Amino acid sequence: MSYPGYPPPAGGYPPGAPGGGAWGGAGYPPPTMPPIGLDNVANYAGQFNQDYLSGVAANMSGTFGGANVPNLYPGAPGGGYPPVPPGGFGQPPPAQQPVPSYGMYPPPGGNPTSGMPSYPPYPGAPVPGQPMLPPGQQPPGVYPGQPPMTYPGQSPVPPPGQQPVPSYPGYSGSGTVTPAVSPAQFGNRGTITDASGFDPLRDAEVLRKAMKGFGTDEQAIIDCLGSRSNKQRQQILLSFKTAYGKDLIKDLKSELSGNFEKTILALMKTPVLFDAYEIKEAIKGAGTDEACLIEILASRSNEHIRELNRVYKTEFKKTLEEAIRSDTSGHFQRLLISLSQGNRDESTNVDMTLVQRDVQELYAAGENRLGTDESKFNAILCSRSRAHLVAVFNEYQRMTGRDIEKSICREMSGDLEQGMLAVVKCLKNTPAFFAERLNKAMRGAGTKDRTLIRIMVSRSEIDLLDIRAEYKRLYGKSLYHDITGDTSGDYRKILLKICGGND
């Protein structure tokens, strides 16, 4: 069967890789990592083991982009928004910026339930099936201070305070549609940001005093490390060794214990290194934590996953793909290997001809046949861009009358079903996906502490504010409330510090 307008002419879908340069494409990784920018300890650098310094510098540069960051907001043609700046925790640089990744909400009206928690639309979104009100009659935006957003051919929007929440335009007919950008991408939506007036040497002294002598001042450690960004914590590590000739990590291990120790040590690793150790732990010994593997690989950006491959090989002397192959099998293994390539299309345009073709192929591979062609689901869900797949999910619902999640539940089972569902949920609404994971970690008898720690730490500088909002919306209680009731002692205190407040 053929479809009008497909395949697209040369230069169409998929888009070409971004050009080379210091921030992506053929030029990535750069021949030399940019400097870390630790000016305040530069005079002491000669005292360190140079292999140790270069390793830390490489990790930090890969994660945070180094100090020589180019202008983040160049002029955009046509008066549109400039590219979204890097957001930390492996977010891609401007030249490789994907479609809304963290903090992404689904199109207005969400999707029908499929036996799983329903992910609601953004506050202020129109009633499903109803057209958007014209500018000037829109409900107030939920992000005060956000600059007005305009698109080619659109009438001027109201000033801040009277501005609508951006929404996806209707997908009808063929052609190319550029989706709106999620408000959560404009600014940091994490609970932890760079501390103002930061002095790593002073913080090193505070930590030294907290662990010196008889007993440990756990509250001082919580107040210090729980309110510094990951980049700042890496500087504290260097300053501590400079000032005292001791390894801060070893001192923390000797003074702390239990889940409190695990949380503090998680905060001290760079985001990519933390993920590498979480994956290593997930496949170690008897049994595999499949949910951990799919959570990490389904939710991280392309650049973060590429850096994760490099760090994993350096730390454990085997590739990430080799580790996955050694501990998984079948279609679930293929799904993980596909995601571990960090090669998802990052285009922001949507070709509706290709969308309709993918919908037809997904339907033919599942609901419209005896048995399931899992490889077709894998190929489409792991390679297409986020914007394209959101359009596919909407069109699938329109054309088949069934939500894509419900079809996956009907056609698959076991780890593959859970893996495919995780990919779809991350694409639709990343904060809601993590809210559901947190709720499951604390629900019922016992707490899945590793999951709780991993999500709280890894999302603390990205979208934990959005996760908190989704948690309250889905479960009627605040995340802060449930953490308080499910944990205790210093472990509870550090998690609540990361949580950042009650809703």
UniProtKB/Swiss-Prot annotation:
Any single GO CC term annotated in Swiss-Prot or TrEMBL for this entry: nuclear envelope
SUPFAM superfamilies: Annexin (SSF47874)
One Pfam family it belongs to: Annexin
Reported tissue expression: Expressed in a wide variety of tissues.
Database matches in InterPro entries: Annexin, Annexin_repeat, Annexin_repeat_CS, Annexin_sf, ANX11
Presence of the UniProt keyword Nucleotide-binding in the record: no
Compositional bias (Pro residues): 80-97, 118-167
Keywords: Acetylation, Annexin, Calcium, Calcium/phospholipid-binding, Cell cycle, Cell division, Cytoplasm, Cytoskeleton, Nucleus, Repeat
Positions carrying N6-acetyllysine: K246, K253, K477
Spans annotated as Disordered: 80-197
One of the GO BP terms on file: cytokinetic process
Family the entry assigns: Belongs to the annexin family.
Protein name per its UniProtKB record: Annexin A11
